[in-house]
Amino acid sequence: YDWDSFYQRHTNGNWYARQGCAEKISFTEEGLIPQVEITSCGLNGKPLIAQGEYPAYIACHIFTDKPQMYVAPGFPKIMQENTDGEECLSYISDMYNSATAGFKYFEFKGVKEISVATRGYASGVMELSTEMNGKVVGEIPIGYTNVWVKASCKPDIPDGVHALYITFKGEGTTQLRTVSFN
């Protein structure tokens, strides 16, 4: 049998808006269920291919260096921008210095460039790493803009299955819409 875990996480910085998520459940030989890891893959059953563009709202970890309630004012959060009847644009808002969006897992093969689409009143870099608080493997410069702008870097990520953590370091706050692989 295949077992799955379905859960919700808060969005829009309040207790009422939720995003549905799901993960595969595995069993040990003794029939026990180890803690189910939260990933960006959902029920896909395998890592995401590091090619093309992915929306930032699939980040499975969103955090800062300061402990806070995940619905606290100003805390990074998944937001939507739309009016009734329109397709929804989702992104991570309120990314200030130390804010991190973590994605688990991507299968990297020959990735030469990673791009992010950001907008906001911020100046600094998006640091890339393959481990939480790990070695920086690339930096993407970002600046002040009130429209979505893509910027990129050539990261030092070996082929294989890795997490990707994107951490803003700088002044102000920005929004993260997508991450792209070339």
Task: Go through the PLM ranges and name each one.
Residues Y1-E139, G143-N182:
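Carbohydrate-active catalytic/glycan-binding domains of CAZyme proteins
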